[in-house]
Amino acid sequence: MPMMPRADSRFRFLHVEALEPRQLLSSTPWGAGSLDTAEYLLGDVGVTLVLMESQGSVSSEDWTTESIEAVKTKVAEGLQWWKDTLAAQSSVHSLNFVFDTSYADNPVPTTVEPIARTSNTYVTWVNEFLTYVQANSSETISTDIRHFNDSQRQALSTHWAFTIFVVNDENDADGQFAAGGSFSRAFAFPGGQFYVAPAGRPAATFAHELGHIFWARDEYSGAGSYDDQRGYYDAQNWNAANNPTAGFEQVDSIMASGTLMTDAYAQHISSPSSLEMIGWRDTDQDGVFDVLDVPHQLQGTGAFDPVTGKYRFVGSASVQSLPNLNSSGQHND
């Protein structure tokens, strides 16, 4: 067998070993505490979908295999809207939802029929859920649900996590909670807590409520105000219906209502101020949103090793974080 000619040792190809793949977000976001479960809408988001099943004589609604699957499909569609909208905004960032549907496939028992009560009765059945999953404590519902969401974040290996409660309204006359409560239909507790929606609401509602989870404000009349501020940049709610600026006209937005909301949903757009509240702001127009577009340094030295034929670099890297200006939440950077 002929011998291959030996390569001339005076000439070597430079060999570069690739570093392991990195994403802009690759773990629990830097600086986030256990209660920081939804600071900006980027990366991987854990979603726990919960259905409650009333027991005994109070029951007027019953989940079926078909209705459960319909809910799962609608929720996925509503959240997919945000993925598609981000894709139109940026080619750099990613957004993925990781679902835990175990509490939807096997609805959680409750002593009340949620849709037949006022919306404020959520205190009863959300506490029953927290007890069911062994997450109920002497703390508030807000704290307990955030701790639960944090445990789900760890279990699902995501950056953020929140919970959705979908209420069965199939047999309800108007698909609304009983009169006398704070809300008639869907409502949310912002900053990585949870939202509640009757099953009969459209997919756009599920997209709208997710905006609240990541700090966006309502923009329709009687809800959010133009002087409200929230989100990582503490952005102002400029697209609110009550903006007094001369000549102001509301633009289509997922956080509005009526045709402004439905048109925004159809076009995969939202108001600039609502997008800023969820973290989607690119001040220098370089394609990277401000929250992740932060100064970084790389220092080190390198040399070619003639024995191994490899170039070896030894150094260190450091990165700063953008201050969290949110006037709500935990204020962790």
Question: Each PLM stretch: what is its role?
Answer:
Residues 1-27:
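Subset of Sec-pathway N-terminal targeting signals
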Residues 203-219:
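Active-site recognition of the HExxH zinc-binding catalytic motif
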Residues 189-207:
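Short pre-active-site segment immediately N-terminal to the catalytic Zn-binding motif
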Residues 50-55, 165-171, 199-201, 216-217, ...:
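Active-site-proximal beta-strand/loop segments in catalytic clefts of secreted hydrolases
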Residues 43-48, 158-163, 190-193, 217, ...:
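Loop/turn elements at helix/coil->beta-strand transitions in domains of secreted/extracellular proteins
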Residues 28-157, 193, 201, 299, ...:
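Propeptide-to-catalytic entry region of secreted or membrane-anchored zinc metalloproteases
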Residues 138-185:
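Auxiliary, metal-adjacent structural segments of Zn-dependent hydrolase domains
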